[in-house]
Amino acid sequence: MPSRPDKNLETFPNPTQERDYHIHMEIPEFTCLCPKTGQPDFATLILDYIPDKKCVELKSLKLYIWSFRDENAFHEAVTNRIVDDLATALQPRYLRLTAKFYVRGGIFTTVVAEHRHSGWTPLPSVDLFHFDSQPSTRG
């Protein structure tokens, strides 16, 4: 496998397709270039997805992310492009990318973009921190 930037996203079969489960990744080394100034823009990407048939292979994701370091891109455009590329490669049930860009001109920018597979409905959320372990039906 190459160890230089690469736009190819590799996948592998989801080992548990019968269950909705959440994959969370934090990618603190994203870099692209500001199309106005040519200066580097840095961001932490937070990727959350619920796979369907495929999962993303981590090294290919790293090389894909590196491939943006010499590209001119507005924050909004690059965030949505990454979502589109991941959605095309993975065809997930749900995917959300949060791009938290470092300060530029005194402004922090966060861009959030989502993809939802048509027809997919999330299961009800379970919040164990607020789970009532002593419901009123018990004495």
UniProtKB/Swiss-Prot annotation:
Substrate binds at residues 56-58, 75-76. Belongs to the GTP cyclohydrolase I family. QueF type 1 subfamily. It catalyses: 7-aminomethyl-7-carbaguanine + 2 NADP(+) = 7-cyano-7-deazaguanine + 2 NADPH + 3 H(+). One of its GO terms (biological process) is tRNA modification. Its EC number is 1.7.1.13. This is NADPH-dependent 7-cyano-7-deazaguanine reductase. Pathway: tRNA modification; tRNA-queuosine biosynthesis. GO terms for cellular component: cytoplasm. The keyword DNA-binding does not apply. The active site is at residues 34, 41. GO terms for molecular function: preQ1 synthase activity. Catalyzes the NADPH-dependent reduction of 7-cyano-7-deazaguanine (preQ0) to 7-aminomethyl-7-deazaguanine (preQ1). It comes from the Bacteria. The keyword Oxidoreductase applies. It holds the Pfam family QueF. Keywords: Cytoplasm, NADP, Oxidoreductase, Queuosine biosynthesis.
